[in-house]
């Protein structure tokens, strides 16, 4: 213990020294913005736990790798960039309409309301190209001749052994068949993609998670296979999707299997529906399988979609659905028995009519399972969806003008439950914007594919008012602030009575020099929680208080060397139990020589938390299409290094090594995931071939 304490003290001293050394830097190089920084600032602790944000990350990564041509860009494409406000999108399109094609990205500073940070972020996702004829029908021979293809493969190698990979006697496995994983410990994925400009896409994704069997009796190939074809903007046809696809209409009350804005991201954009999108990620839930079509008839866009998909579920002895399984793991006989054991058939329509700044839409969805969802015996689930068929419909509406933007949707679910969400964005000036949002989701509202703005993560049993402000206080100082007051009319998990809460955030970004950037975020949340005595008798509700602090310093030492220092601090307070807290201090460095052949990202961090409840989330650089937003608790150290080498215009190699050392335990994890030791070392490899 004495050696560990001494080691911890030394590590803290090292990181504090690095922190102040970074503060003392006074360089003369331009501040570097990356889309990784954008994701980190838009993502909260709650957001990163949802698969939809992994899809969002994949989409951003793909746009970054295949940027839009600014001279042919559409409003729908601009809306996929989460840092653009509705008014700025209109201003970009208006500039193109009045001034014609852009000659260089330097013209962005001439667009009305275009601030410095947005000018730095946009070149990560756009380029200046030739103006093309819109909605032209491409010839098949041109598609095949000029289309671009890509093969991307990834291999994760854990340099340790979990309990699920140990050898056990046959007698033990006969009694406990789920004690051992059926496959090896490697995780492997393979992606093939083709695209012809922004009009034609197709691809195939194959994935095998750690522990899953492959190329054997249990799985003849990979555990997960996905294929898609997407065609956009051909004549009157807006979009045609075949295979796996995702949908997002309105504010997400009826249909949204794409990502939903968190409270921080709401300050940057409005998050209107994006329509039909291909599903090319390795996420094994949140997508449809079938056909979707969007067609333009006058000023109305008509979208039709049909899906017949197999889903994972937990079934009882009567083969009724008790819950859906969304983690995609099929490592043991028990997990494999839940694979694709329920079929879900879905059909729907969406209409969107536009006129003079107004958009009026209507969505109707019907879906049916081959078995029924069982009524839960848990009191807080008394109003949850039951049965095997569901019908949901809603109306969404948008009004855009120079001074204000109004977005909303109102929906009705099976059984008459209602939901509504409405937001008003006031553009007070070029520097100040206010946002007011009201939502009311009844306790008996059922929409199985809804994903909208909420506190509890579901579109049910919630009412709240959100007030936010986005302020450019000066040329170098930006501030974002919000307060969200919410209540639940019915019970929630571990909340045995109607409850209420409040969520407050203040976020500041300061760039005093072109080489220095400072970022600070404070978040306070109060939510009611059950109080019980030593005999587990319910005594009532009491507030649990959470404080979250994050500070970040960015510094460019040279055109090729970039430093980032992060400090996270969490504190939880509940009744007289005192408080538990945790912090994470890290230093990251990025090196990219002028030749652009190689790039190195490395980081080191020390974490110390009192409990799992005070765990700290942190984002670190990783491989392409790898969403790396992980949590740490206890006491330990995290090291990682990522190397990217662009061997040529065709080949790219990436490798990442991650090392986690715990000072407060001799084992990591539990059950099949248990590691005998205090170390976790992982190796990640990736190869990309473009042709």
Where are these regions (language model features)?
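Exposed, low-structure sequence patches enriched in small/polar residues
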Residues: 181-185, 286-288, 342-375, 382-691
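Bacterial Sec-dependent N-terminal signal peptides
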Residues: 1-34, 691
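Small-residue hinge/turn detector
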Residues: 85-89, 115-116
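Extended, structured, electrostatic nucleic-acid-contact surfaces
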Residues: 61-82, 98, 104-110, 125-126
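Outer-membrane beta-barrel proteins
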Residues: 207-224, 277-284, 337-340, 411-413, ...
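N-terminal, intrinsically disordered low-complexity tails/presequences enriched in Lys/Ser/Pro
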Residues: 29-68, 131-146
């Amino acid at each position: 213990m004495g050696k560990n304490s001494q080691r911890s003290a030394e590590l803290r001293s090292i990181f504090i020294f690095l922190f102040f050394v970074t503060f003392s830097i006074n360089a003369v190089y331009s501040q570097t913005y990356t889309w990784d920084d954008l994701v980190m600032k838009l993502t909260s602790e709650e957001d990163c736990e949802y698969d939809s944000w992994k899809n969002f990350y994949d989409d951003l990564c793909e746009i970054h790798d295949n940027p839009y041509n600014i001279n042919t860009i559409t409003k729908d494409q601009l809306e996929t960039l989460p840092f653009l406000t509705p008014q700025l999108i209109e201003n970009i399109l208006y500039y193109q309409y009045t001034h014609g094609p852009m000659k260089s990205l330097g013209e962005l500073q001439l667009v009305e309301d275009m601030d410095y940070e947005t000018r730095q972020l946009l070149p990560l996702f756009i380029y200046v190209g030739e103006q093309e004829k819109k909605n032209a029908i491409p010839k098949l021979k041109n598609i095949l001749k000029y289309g671009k293809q890509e093969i991307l493969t990834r291999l994760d190698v854990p340099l340790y052994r979990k309990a699920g990979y140990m050898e056990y006697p046959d007698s033990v496995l006969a009694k406990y068949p789920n004690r051992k994983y059926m496959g090896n410990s490697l995780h492997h994925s393979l992606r093939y993609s083709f695209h012809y400009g922004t009009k034609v896409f197709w691809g195939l994704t194959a994935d095998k998670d750690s522990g899953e069997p492959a190329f054997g009796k249990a799985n003849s190939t990979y555990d997960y296979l996905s294929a898609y074809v997407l065609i956009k903007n051909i004549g009157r046809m807006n979009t045609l999707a075949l295979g796996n696809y995702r949908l997002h209409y309105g504010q997400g009350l009826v249909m949204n299997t794409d990502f939903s804005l968190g409270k921080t991201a709401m300050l940057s954009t409005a998050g209107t529906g994006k329509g039909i999108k291909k599903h090319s990620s390795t996420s094994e839930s949140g997508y449809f399988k079938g056909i979707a079509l969007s067609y333009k008839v006058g000023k109305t866009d008509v979208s039709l979609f049909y899906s017949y998909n197999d889903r994972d579920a937990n079934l009882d002895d009567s083969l009724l659905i008790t819950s859906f399984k969304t983690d995609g793991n099929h490592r043991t006989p028990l997990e494999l028995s839940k694979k694709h054991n329920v079929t879900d058939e879905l059909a729907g329509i969406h209409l969107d009519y536009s006129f003079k700044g107004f958009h009026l839409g209507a969505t109707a969805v019907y879906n049916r399972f081959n078995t029924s969802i069982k009524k839960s015996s848990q009191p807080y689930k008394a109003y949850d969806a039951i049965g095997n068929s569901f019908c949901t419909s809603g109306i969404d509406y948008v009004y855009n003008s120079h001074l204000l933007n109004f977005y909303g949707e109102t929906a009705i679910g099976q059984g008459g439950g209602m939901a509504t969400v409405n937001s008003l964005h006031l553009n007070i000036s070029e520097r100040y914007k206010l946002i007011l949002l009201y939502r009311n989701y009844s306790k008996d509202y059922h929409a199985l594919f809804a994903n909208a703005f909420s506190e509890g993560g579901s579109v049910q049993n919630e009412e709240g008012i959100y007030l936010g402000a986005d302020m450019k206080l000066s040329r170098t100082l930006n501030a974002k602030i919000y307060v969200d007051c919410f209540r639940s009319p019915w019970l929630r998990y571990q909340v045995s009575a109607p409850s209420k809460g409040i969520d407050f955030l203040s976020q500041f970004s300061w760039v005093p020099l072109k080489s220095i950037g400072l970022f600070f975020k404070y978040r306070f949340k109060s939510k009611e929680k059950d109080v019980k005595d030593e005999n587990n008798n319910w005594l009532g509700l009491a507030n649990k208080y959470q404080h979250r602090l994050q500070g970040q310093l960015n510094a460019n030492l040279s055109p090729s060397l970039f430093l980032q220092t992060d400090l996270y601090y969490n504190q939880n307070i509940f009744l007289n139990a005192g408080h538990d807290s945790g912090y994470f201090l890290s230093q990251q460095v990025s090196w990219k020589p002028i030749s652009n052949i190689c790039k190195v990202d490395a980081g080191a961090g020390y974490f110390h938390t009192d409990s799992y409840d005070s765990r700290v989330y942190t984002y670190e650089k990783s491989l392409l299409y790898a969403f790396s937003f992980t949590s740490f608790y206890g006491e330990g150290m995290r090291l990682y290094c990522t190397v990217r080498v662009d061997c040529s215009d065709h080949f790219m190699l990436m490798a990442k090594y991650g090392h986690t050392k715990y000072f407060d335990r001799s084992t990591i994890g539990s059950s099949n995931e248990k590691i005998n030791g205090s170390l976790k070392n992982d190796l990640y490899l990736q190869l990309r071939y473009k042709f």
